[in-house]
């Protein structure tokens, strides 16, 4: 936009409207500037004003003309068609975009040396550490997980911090920015804060040293009584009802509400936290915590927990995924693989992909929703072997088996082996069905990438070899920026099915005692997978009926679930 100086006539109109300036020569305006829409305004420093020629919607169907009324501005740029009114203190050192509505606020200010929460180093998972996660606008769950997991690697840690700092220094604005279409009303204090396009701040108590991202299709809402300090808020997030966020990264489309207090934590992708608190917590994608008593501290949470239930909360059960604890009198019993055939798991498998509310433009964190993958199947293989070893050591006729101080009934142990085996058959059939779509001959993989251990890097399922390669490539300069690292994550995710086939092919041969995989073998494996899938859905149906009898679900929900199970013919994840 080009600006010009005020004319004498415009200055006279402004003065008649009770406006004044330290120096009218420092007030610059657009070519079509209209002074009639400014009243009771005081200007200090360098001022740049856009057009005021349109109405702006301040509430649904309630339009007011753009302009500036009852405000003090110092070193401020105001875009076209903004309405700024009732600024009780002042606006200082800010650039305000087009079509913004700012009303009934106290202070909006940028002070010297601020970084808007970017570059802040926090301690996640380990509160005693010197800090392991660098807050930056590019942060996603994978990058944060890498920082936490390898925080002991000084070379990697320093390299990542330097990358983040270089990027921040390049992009950091000299003063605060309010994006286009932003609405700020009934808010006390906003200092050293960037507000992205189409954000709304309504009734907040304080925003300080914070970057709030936002776009037209993923705007951010910050509501009543919210305090947010030294943090970064991603596209589509919402902070509501007296939430307190300090030294945090809040990811895409996350909701923090109802007095939830978060400190020194990272929260990613579709998480919903209400009433409780988080401290030095790594809340991966789809972390849900809605209890007033919930305390997320020094741990990693997220979608993976929803699939594994009690296992991740009990160290004695970590090697037996999908298991459950029950008590009878003073005895605690372990029921292996119990959760694998529950309606709760079935709901989770189908629910989470549908609940990803992120628009494509705001999907930074990668989330692989496969509940059966090389990562989880490897755990299942080991768990099945543990149960078989217990049976072999104590004998098939033993009434009970002991595992890390927990008792496993004989029937539960046998059922656990069957459930784990059922999952393995479902998985193998699903992989073959997918591969047949583009490789009907089921050719043996020609690469080793995908062999060995796998990891879940906060939603990204990948071979450990690829994860270690990322670490080495960061340290030797092959990956020379945060953007390059993020692109590598995307590339690995895109290769998931190929890596999965490399891992699964030898597993299938070993499981079925084959030397090669023929079309006839594939038909046999898919047939067994379909039978296993039917057994699985029958078990889930029985569990749903139990929930209905206990009053946990109503009859309509039960019928809907049965209808869904009746159409379960696809054995793919």
At which residue positions do the language-model features occur?
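Glycine-rich hexapeptide-repeat left-handed beta-helix
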Residues: 9-52, 56-68, 77, 85-172, ...
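Long, structured ligand/cofactor-binding scaffold of large enzymes
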Residues: 70, 79, 170, 176, ...
């Amino acid at each position: 936009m080009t600006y010009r100086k005020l004319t004498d006539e415009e200055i006279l109109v402004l003065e008649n409207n009770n406006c004044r300036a330290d120096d009218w020569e420092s007030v610059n305006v657009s070519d079509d500037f209209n002074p009639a829409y400014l009243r009771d305004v005081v200007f200090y420093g360098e001022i740049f004003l856009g057009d005021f020629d349109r109405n702006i919607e301040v509430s649904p169907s309630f339009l007011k003309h753009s302009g500036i009324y009852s405000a003090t501005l110092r070193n401020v740029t105001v875009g076209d068609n903004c309405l700024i009114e009732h600024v009780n203190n002042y606006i200082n050192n800010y650039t305000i975009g087009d079509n913004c509505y700012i009303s009934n606020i106290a202070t909006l200010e940028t002070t010297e040396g601020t970084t808007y929460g970017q570059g802040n180093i926090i301690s996640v998972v380990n509160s005693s550490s010197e800090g392991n996660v660098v807050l930056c606008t590019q942060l996603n769950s994978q990058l944060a997980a890498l920082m936490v997991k390898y925080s002991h690697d000084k070379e990697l840690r320093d390299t990542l911090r330097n990358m983040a700092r270089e990027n921040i220094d390049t992009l950091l604005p000299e003063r605060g920015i309010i994006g286009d279409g932003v609405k700020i009303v009934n808010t006390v204090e906003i200092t050293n804060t960037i507000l992205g396009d189409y954000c709304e701040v309504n009734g907040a108590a304080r925003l300080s040293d914070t970057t709030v991202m936002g776009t037209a299709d993923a705007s951010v809402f910050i509501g009543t009584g919210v305090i947010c300090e030294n943090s970064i808020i991603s596209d589509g997030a919402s902070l509501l009802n007296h939430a307190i966020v300090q030294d945090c990264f809040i990811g895409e489309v996350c909701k923090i509400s109802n007095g939830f207090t978060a400190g020194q934590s990272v929260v990613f992708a579709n998480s919903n936290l209400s009433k409780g608190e988080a401290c030095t917590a790594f809340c991966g994608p789809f972390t849900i915590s809605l209890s007033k008593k919930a305390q997320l501290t020094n741990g990693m949470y997220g979608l993976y927990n929803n699939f594994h239930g009690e296992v991740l909360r009990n160290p004695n059960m970590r090697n037996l995924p999908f298991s459950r604890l029950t008590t009878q009198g003073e005895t605690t019993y372990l029921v292996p693989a119990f959760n694998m055939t529950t309606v709760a798991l079935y709901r989770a498998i189908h629910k989470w992909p549908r609940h990803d509310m992120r628009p494509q433009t705001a999907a930074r964190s990668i989330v692989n929703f496969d509940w059966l993958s090389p990562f989880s199947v490897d755990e299942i293989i080991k768990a099945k072997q543990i149960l078989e070893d217990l049976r072999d050591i104590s004998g098939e006729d033993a009434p009970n088996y002991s595992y890390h101080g927990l008792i496993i009934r004989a029937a539960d142990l046998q059922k656990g082996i069957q459930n784990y085996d059922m999952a393995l058959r479902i998985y193998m059939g699903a992989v073959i069905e997918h591969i047949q779509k583009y490789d009907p001959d089921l050719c043996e993989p020609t690469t080793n990438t995908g062999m060995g251990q796998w990891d879940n890097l906060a939603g990204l399922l990948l071979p450990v070899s690829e994860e270690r390669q990322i670490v080495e490539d960061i340290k030797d300069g092959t990956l020379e920026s945060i953007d390059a690292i993020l692109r590598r994550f995307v590339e690995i995710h895109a290769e998931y099915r190929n890596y999965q086939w490399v891992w699964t092919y030898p597993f299938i041969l070993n499981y079925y005692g084959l030397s090669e995989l023929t079309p006839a073998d594939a038909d046999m494996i898919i047939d067994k997978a379909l039978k296993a899938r039917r057994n699985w859905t029958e078990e889930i149906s029985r569990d749903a009926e139990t929930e209905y009898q206990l009053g946990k679900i109503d009859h309509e929900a039960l019928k809907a679930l049965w209808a869904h199970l009746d159409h379960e013919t696809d054995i793919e994840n």
